[in-house]
Amino acid sequence: MSQTQQALLQVQHVSKHYHDGEVTTQVLSGVDLTVYKGEQLAIVGSSGSGKSTLLHIMGTLDTPTSGTVLLDGEDLYQLSSARQAQIRNQDLGFIYQFHHLLPEFTAIENVAMPAFIQGRDKTQALVDAKNLLERVGLGHRLQHIPAQLSGGERQRVAIARALINKPKLVLADEPTGNLDASSGDNVYAMIRELAQQFGTAFVVVTHDHKLAAKMDRQLTMKDGILQVVAATSPTGLAE
């Protein structure tokens, strides 16, 4: 990243707590973070540190108790639920530890599904899905359902699905957590290459310090507070 790198997503003073009767649990505490266009950012931390909650808030899958989240300057939590859903479909991609592929659909259909939901031409969506699957090395597995794919192959399908609508930002929650070391390395290589090819930003929540160390920036989450671990850019700092 360069000094002129443009901000894509800004998390401003975000806090999150839950109430259970008279007990209040603070999950996030005044988090500030800028994600830049095209960068790869890792957030590491122990279970329960708040990193997945932060990722969900960034993706409008959970609501902050306080604070602001801006995507290209648009305040996500001042929008209607319909507009939020549109942003999730068009501007955001999601990858999870457990791929969440639809079991009755083939690999190509799973990848094309977000494009179908967007209302794109079905024939073109399938062409785009085929191209992405070929890009991640699965051109020979287009018509296989998830049960016929290995764990690494299913995760590659999930990565292709996350990219089908050419999102500005992909949010990945433990994308290598269910894979062996070799498959995990392959997933990272694909993230890096696809980020460079499409200019997509990636935020990856992970326990995998080896994976995190390869990203442009590495932050750690502890007790709901973000801290800088490493950055390859002079702009790569949490505010």
UniProtKB/Swiss-Prot annotation:
Membrane topology: Peripheral membrane protein
UniProt keyword annotations, A-Z: ATP-binding, Cell inner membrane, Cell membrane, Membrane, Nucleotide-binding, Translocase, Transport
Domain of life: Bacteria
Protein name as catalogued: Lipoprotein-releasing system ATP-binding protein LolD
Organism: Shewanella frigidimarina (strain NCIMB 400)
PROSITE patterns xrefs: ABC_TRANSPORTER_1, ABC_TRANSPORTER_2, LOLD
GO molecular function, one term: transmembrane transporter activity
InterPro entries, sorted: AAA+_ATPase, ABC_transporter-like_ATP-bd, ABC_transporter-like_CS, ABC_transpr_LolD-like, LolD_lipo_ATP-bd, MacB-like_ATP-bd, P-loop_NTPase
Binding positions (ATP): 45-52
GO BP annotation list: lipoprotein localization to outer membrane; protein localization to outer membrane
Keyword check for Transport: yes
